[in-house]
Design a protein with these regions (language model features):
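Amphipathic terminal alpha-helices
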Residues: 301-309, 313-338
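NAD(P)H-binding glycine-rich loop region in Rossmannoid oxidoreductase-like domains
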Residues: 50-92, 96, 100
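Catalytic helix-loop patch of NAD(P)-dependent Rossmann-fold dehydrogenases
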Residues: 123-171, 192-195
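N-terminal Rossmann NAD(P)H-binding glycine-rich loop of SDR-like oxidoreductase domains
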Residues: 3-23
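Conserved Rossmann-fold NAD(P)-dependent oxidoreductase catalytic core, especially the SDR/UDP-sugar
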Residues: 96-139
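Conserved C-terminal active-site "lid" loop/helix of NAD(P)H-dependent oxidoreductases
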Residues: 209, 270-313
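Mid/C-terminal beta-alpha module of Rossmann-like enzyme folds, strongest
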Residues: 219-286, 323-326
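Substrate-positioning beta->alpha
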Residues: 177-182, 198-220, 228-229
Length: 338
């Protein structure tokens, strides 16, 4: 079986491509990092260096030709950027690829969306898939919601292709280039001090990346799923952010650090000033109001639909995920013991 994995050179896509190869599948992988792409070739993947946002409809059809599944992980998930760029990468490119999949008769198209579409600067518990923020928190959330709407439209046009959307929350694990690297940079910049609103007491649903890969496999194999269905995916273990960071940074990586509680209103105001300066200087701010709020407000997701329809249960607990992430980071030189 041949599977197309987009965004395969880092993060979730890299985990997905590696798992598929180890499971004996043929993998066609896309991404913009040619060095990481060469590593995928060494593992046995067919790698195509391609920016999907720039790809023509014909190139998209060539990508999906002879593929039974498409796992669409590619996205712009930066906390900062222009509206047009987010929509070009996250919405328009997704629509092009989804249309190509429909035209070429791909059996399953699994799209990685985001719970950011729920976020509205308030605490929430046990949110189900039907909730929407009245106003999206940033361009990223708005563009990912637009991508979902375009997939629903393709599902009506191409009924022979089943389009499934997954919303994993708070991804961490091997090949992450965003969350943990930024934490390590902050620790180095602030000399071992990690400043968080409320001292990191937010209760969050987080997800170990290989568990999302498991959910993607279930979404591809499970019979009878309605096209256009969407599922929350988490580790089923909501945890205080400070506890997760202590387990990873101190216990696994052996880093000495001090967690400093900063009042949320102060950080929110500071982030707003940084955003204003970033707009004038055209440089990404160190903080955004969204990135501050995301680690301040509690957010947990309902898992009933994923359990009942996908049969999803995490393969790795939070404890196992943190341990495996620590092992990977140590191999990459991401921490020093002692």
């Amino acid at each position: 079986m041949r599977v197309l994995v987009t965004g395969a050179t880092s993060g979730l896509g890299r985990n997905a491509a590696q798992w598929l190869l180890e499971a004996g599948h043929q993998v066609r992988a896309t991404g913009r990092d040619e060095r990481a792409g060469e590593a995928l070739r060494q593992l046995g993947a067919e790698f195509c260096a391609l920016d999907l946002a720039q790809a023509t409809p014909q190139q998209c059809r060539q990508l999906v030709t002879d593929c039974e599944w498409v796992w669409h992980c590619a996205a712009k998930s930066s906390p900062w950027g222009g509206k047009a760029e987010f929509h070009r990468i996250n919405a328009a490119a997704t629509e092009k690829l989804a249309e190509a999949a429909g035209r070429c008769g791909v059996r399953r198209f699994v799209h990685i969306s985001t719970p950011a579409i729920y976020f509205d600067f308030q605490p929430h518990y046990d949110l189900d898939e039907g909730y929407r923020a009245r106003r999206f928190a940033n361009h990223y959330a708005a563009s990912k919601h637009a991508a979902e709407q375009r997939l629903l439209a393709q599902a009506k046009i191409y009924p022979q292709t089943t389009y499934i959307m997954l919303r994993p929350r708070g991804l961490f694990g091997p090949h992450d280039r965003v969350i943990v690297p930024r934490l390590l940079q902050q620790l180095e910049r602030d000399r071992g001090v990690l400043r968080l609103p409320g001292g990191g007491q937010a209760l969050l649903d987080l997800t170990f990346a290989p568990n999302v890969v498991h959910a993607m496999e279930l979404a591809s194999r499970q019979r009878g799923l309605p096209s256009g269905a969407v599922y929350n995916i988490t580790n089923h273990q909501p945890q205080r952010l400070a506890e997760m960071l202590d387990a990873l940074l101190r216990q696994e990586l052996g880093l000495s650090y001090r967690l400093q509680a900063v009042p949320y209103p102060l950080l929110h105001t500071l982030a707003g000033g940084m955003e204003l300066w970033a707009t004038l200087s055209c440089k990404e701010p160190l903080l955004t109001r969204y990135s501050v709020a995301a680690v301040h407000f509690d957010m947990t997701l309902n898992q009933t639909r994923a359990i009942e329809e996908l049969g999803y249960r995490p393969r790795y607990s939070m404890e196992e995920g943190i341990r495996l992430t620590g092992e990977w980071l140590r191999r990459q030189g991401g921490g020093q013991h002692g």
